[in-house]
Amino acid sequence: MARARRVKRDSVTHIYQTCKQAGTCPPDVINKVEQTTVADNILKYGSAGVFFGGLGIGTGRGTGGVTGYTPLSEGPGIRVGNTPTVVRPSLVPEAVGPMDILPIDTIDPVEPSVSSVVPLTESSGADLLPGEVETIAEIHPVPEGPTIDSPVVTTSKGSSAILEVAPEPTPPTRVRVSRTQYHNPSFQIITDSTPTQGESSLADHILVTSGSGGQTIGSDITDVIELQEFPSRYSFEIDEPTPPRQSSTPIERPQVVGRRRGISLTNRRLIQQVAVEDPLFLSKPSKLVRFSFDNPVFEEEVTNIFEQDVDMVEEPPDRDFLDVRQLGRPQYSTTPAGYVRVSRLGTRGTIRTRSGAQIGSQVHFYRDLSSINTEDPIELQLLGQHSGDSTIVQGPVESTFVNVDISENPLSESIQAFSDDLLLDETVEDFSGSQLVIGNRRSTTSYTVPRFETTRSGSYYVQDTKGYYVAYPESRNNEEIIYPTPDLPVVIIHTHDNSGDFFLHPSLRRRKRKRKYL
């Protein structure tokens, strides 16, 4: 019989990760991962009372830790528990006293006559201002270049000798110049001869100023450029009135002569033309097809599809949109009269087949927008206060006009006399501000009548101290409620009591028995 092969168990860490959540971990796996074995407990509780840090005992690899091992033959090591030795320097530092810096005289504090004022010694203070600027120029001598041996060419013939001499190479010269400058904020250097605005170019300087003139420095001017005067900021021109426009911002676009693809919306043979006057057609066209709620977030700029049940018949808000199942997006065009037209192409679902298909005609819904009317220009007045622009008009009530003829003599007998009827008062009497007195006795009481300001006819309020009654004719039908009573009569029974506080009804008294035979 073959012996079963032993399968190696998985690592402890992987077993702990898979079985910890299920709670099926072996005890040895839990103790090893969580460090709760017997050896771990000995080290854990034993290290609390004993310290083996300086002996090099640990669970490392035997390398001596971070600092390594100390050989026995080399100097003494540091013992655990003892105070470390303080390393002192070989030279003792000397203390610097005040005598080395400034001479100080001692004062006897016992003698009261000694002054406590310390005399000041005159010494030259430090110069804080910069002195002379020292300029140092370091010039390095030219080093000697390498020597080049030139070959000498000789010939044995009688011709002249030709010597080829190579030029000596010249090394670059290195010069370093140092410069020191101090900034003085109270001194300003003017680099230009004329403190005006201008532009400089090489040797010929041309200064261009506005209103203050200028100077020309350099060569003579050869070319004269004719300058044009710019108008001042207060001058303006009044333009001619523009012709009437069809839009607020007209754009000149070239007219493209071509044929539009598809069916034209104005084709009356194939598409029904319906003019819409309701302004909801521009913003919310779906409200003309069916009753719905208003959603301010949704903008109807796309095609609207309306689904309607076959058995359900709804009346639209507008009869022109009856049986409309699809309404296209808005299209903008221009009419021959110059108006802007907003169009929407709709499809009706008038007929429905058994298969579910809807058949209907196409409808062109459009609305022409109003044109921009051209108004006459209005002369505007300047803002502000100006003399002679105000007009004061006084009515005839506030002024008196007297017709006086200076040419006539007042004492002349030919003066025309006026009639006395002109002196009569033609004023209509108005009792709107009068008071009404109630009572026939002499000692009457005055009552204040309030006046109500109204645009209607005058109304007055009169106070009556005797009171008044207001009768409102009305009739009420109060139904009488009949409560049901039992058929048996109500019998009140009083018990016989000799106390004498009540009387028993005679019918309730006990009758005496009559005996027929004694």
Swiss-Prot record:
Keywords, in A-Z order: Capsid protein, Cytoplasmic inwards viral transport, Disulfide bond, DNA-binding, Host endosome, Host Golgi apparatus, Host nucleus, Host-virus interaction, Late protein, Microtubular inwards viral transport, Phosphoprotein, Viral penetration into host nucleus, Virion, Virus entry into host cell
GO biological process, one term: viral penetration into host nucleus
Gene Ontology MF terms in the entry: DNA binding; structural molecule activity
InterPro entries according to UniProt: Late_L2
CC terms in the record's Gene Ontology section: host cell; host cell endosome; host cell Golgi apparatus; host cell nucleus; viral capsid
Post-translational modification summary for this protein: Highly phosphorylated.
Annotated signal peptide: none
Motif window: Nuclear localization signal: 1-10, 510-517
Subcellular location: Virion; Host nucleus; Host early endosome; Host Golgi apparatus
One Pfam family matching this protein: Late_protein_L2
Subunit record text: Interacts with major capsid protein L1. Interacts with E2; this interaction inhibits E2 transcriptional activity but not the DNA replication function E2. Interacts with host GADD45GIP1. Interacts with host HSPA8; this interaction is required for L2 nuclear translocation. Interacts with host importins KPNB2 and KPNB3. Forms a complex with importin alpha2-beta1 heterodimers via interaction with the importin alpha2 adapter. Interacts with host DYNLT1; this interaction is essential for virus intracellular transport during entry.
HAMAP family, per database record: PPV_L2
Family in the record: Belongs to the papillomaviridae L2 protein family.
Function of the protein: Minor protein of the capsid that localizes along the inner surface of the virion, within the central cavities beneath the L1 pentamers. Plays a role in capsid stabilization through interaction with the major capsid protein L1. Once the virion enters the host cell, L2 escorts the genomic DNA into the nucleus by promoting escape from the endosomal compartments and traffic through the host Golgi network.
Protein name according to UniProt: Minor capsid protein L2
